[in-house]
Swiss-Prot record:
Organism: Oryza sativa subsp. japonica (Rice)
Protein name: 3-hydroxy-3-methylglutaryl-coenzyme A reductase 1
SUPFAM superfamilies: NAD-binding domain of HMG-CoA reductase, Substrate-binding domain of HMG-CoA reductase
Span list, region Disordered: 78-111
Transmembrane helix among keywords: yes
Pathway field: Metabolic intermediate biosynthesis; (R)-mevalonate biosynthesis; (R)-mevalonate from acetyl-CoA: step 3/3
């Protein structure tokens, strides 16, 4: 019995020693690791059985087993274990790869990676041995990381990206703020409309767009507004919202939490808990809605010059932590329950507002309507009723009672570093036109309840977008009056929409829309290229 066991132990040790020659194995590393693990388990069991026999001392076979177990973890050629760089928020560990596919300098920490040459790193990324998203943390050089990722992408896909610009971007600035795993940036033309005379000040409005005729149209609207004495704006409300979803054991219990959260007597306490998250975030109100035993609590707060989504989310987490002490049976489902509502056209935003709620108006003189807009006051009023009001109602629009507010909002958002996806709710707008001064002049207004903008954070840090904000005089934070820059930017958005609405409606009323687009938004060049 002892002889057979001894022979098995010898074979195990021999196999283990052969398995230690990592680089000499023709098998993939995952198979080699599996064999090594089996050998480790068998050797450990064998050693434990022998050690449990106290009537006989350890022999050569047992000593060899101990040596093997030690050498397995101390072998100089063994692949290094994953370093702390795995804790990068991506969720997931590195897959084992053949040693030849991963250059030796990459087995260590960032210092070794920095010394590796570009070819080694690109090969590792292309093969999957080095995850692309770790390049910045391993190299410590964001520009180099983007350049090598770009080359690895070319090798993996077999397609070049020469037309995608690389130089001219500050890749360090976007790290952890704007974009992950960058390989370049997209160029968009930026036009300037204006001057827009708004609240007694002139603005030259930057617009990033690929739609020909858009900037020209807004520019014409600005000219009509300025020639008539300018436009005026009113900020109705300033409050970013976040609505977590929580679940309670019963609808009755959810109603109790609703009553507690909305009670005026508890507001100061909840506001104090909420406001701990920021110097600028200040809770304004809490409104709740029930769906069975699920409760949606809509927290609204001012956020200074930031758009404020992160700010309000942190404050909400503070309040949820407090409420769980008061209502220990409350189960937090999500910090966002879609009652906020972010990046979706919703009735709650249309009615309650989100971000900045702005009204902008102007009285356009009759002669300006005729000379600049090439139409009449009567035609414009009739068109607005039939198209923007009745037509949108027939379509079942939700906040879409306008001609093309989204066009202007998106162009301004991209130019000034806002979140383009928030164009969804920010473009909710109702355009109103009326005859005034005995029908001689035109009163036009736009009401926009959910303009979500900021002058700090997000894409506002990028050089191009910061330049556009600077052009408008709203770059960065207003230290003298926190929040003033973001509020002014919201009014500029509304004023620009006013100009765009006025000009497009005039083009439709006069029948000039198609002619204008044929002049400024032609696709004939692309068609000719495709044909050739």
């Amino acid at each position: 019995m002892d002889v057979r066991r001894g022979g098995g132990g010898g074979r195990i040790v021999g196999a283990a020693r052969r398995a230690l020659t990592w680089g000499a194995l023709p098998l993939p590393m995952r198979i080699t690791n599996g064999l090594a693990m089996v050998s480790l388990v068998l050797s450990s069991c064998d050693l434990l059985r022998l050690c449990s026999d106290r009537e006989r001392p350890l022999g050569g076979r047992e000593f060899a087993t101990v040596v093997y177990l030690v050498s397995l973890f101390a072998h100089p050629d063994a692949p290094a274990t994953t370093t702390g760089d795995d804790d990068d928020g991506q969720g997931g560990s590195r897959r084992a790869r053949p040693a030849a596919a991963e250059p030796a300098p990459m087995h260590g920490h960032g210092g070794g990676m920095m010394e590796a040459d570009d070819e080694e790193i690109v090969a590792a990324v292309a093969s999957g041995a080095l995850p692309s998203h770790r390049l910045e943390s391993r190299l410590g050089d964001c520009r180099r990381a983007a350049r090598l990722r770009r080359e690895a992408l070319r090798r993996v896909t077999g397609r070049g990206v020469e037309g995608l610009p690389f130089d001219g971007m500050d890749y360090q600035a976007i790290l952890g703020q704007c974009c992950e795993m960058p390989v370049g940036y997209v160029q968009l033309p930026v036009g300037v409309a204006g001057p827009l005379l708004l609240d007694g000040r002139e603005y030259h409005v930057p617009m990033a767009t690929t739609e020909g005729c858009l900037v020209a149209s807004v520019n014409r609207g600005c000219r009509a507004i300025s020639a008539s004495g300018g436009a005026f704006s009113v900020l109705l409300r300033d409050a970013m919202s976040r609505a977590p979803a929580v679940k309670l054991p019963s609808a009755m219990r959810a109603a109790e939490l609703k009553a507690f959260a909305e009670a005026p007597a508890n507001f100061e306490l909840l506001a104090a808990v909420f406001n701990r998250s920021s110097r600028f975030g200040r809770l304004q109100d809490i409104r709740c809605a029930l769906a069975g035993r699920n409760l949606y609590m809509r927290f609204s707060c001012i956020t200074g010059d930031a758009m404020g989504m992160n700010m309000v989310s942190k404050g909400v987490e503070n309040v949820l932590g407090y409420l769980q002490n008061v209502f220990p049976d409350m189960d937090v489902i999500s910090v966002s329950g879609n009652y906020c509502s972010d990046k979706k056209p919703t009735a709650v935003n249309w009615i309650e507002g989100r971000g900045k709620s702005v009204v902008c108006e102007a009285i356009i003189k009759g002669d300006v309507v005729q000379k600049v807009l090439k139409t009449t006051v009567e035609k414009l009023v009739e068109l607005n009723i039939i198209k923007n009001l009745a037509g949108s109602a027939v379509a079942g629009a939700l906040g879409g009672f306008n001609a093309h507010a989204s066009n202007i909002v998106t162009a301004l958002f991209i130019a000034t570093g806002q979140d383009p996806a928030q164009n969804v709710e920010s473009s909710q707008c109702i355009t109103m036109l009326e005859e005034v001064n005995d029908g001689d002049d035109l009163h036009i207004s736009v009401t926009m309840p959910s303009i979500e903008v900021g002058t700090i954070g997000g894409g506002t840090c990028l050089a191009s977008q910061a330049a556009c904000l600077n052009l408008l005089g709203v770059k960065g934070s207003n230290h003298g009056s926190p929040g003033a820059n973001a509020k002014r930017l919201a009014t500029i958005v509304a004023g620009s929409v006013l100009a765009g609405e006025l000009s497009l409606l005039a083009a439709l009323a006069s029948g000039h829309l198609v002619k204008s687009h044929m002049m400024y938004n032609r696709s004939s060049k692309d068609v000719a290229k495709a044909a050739s």
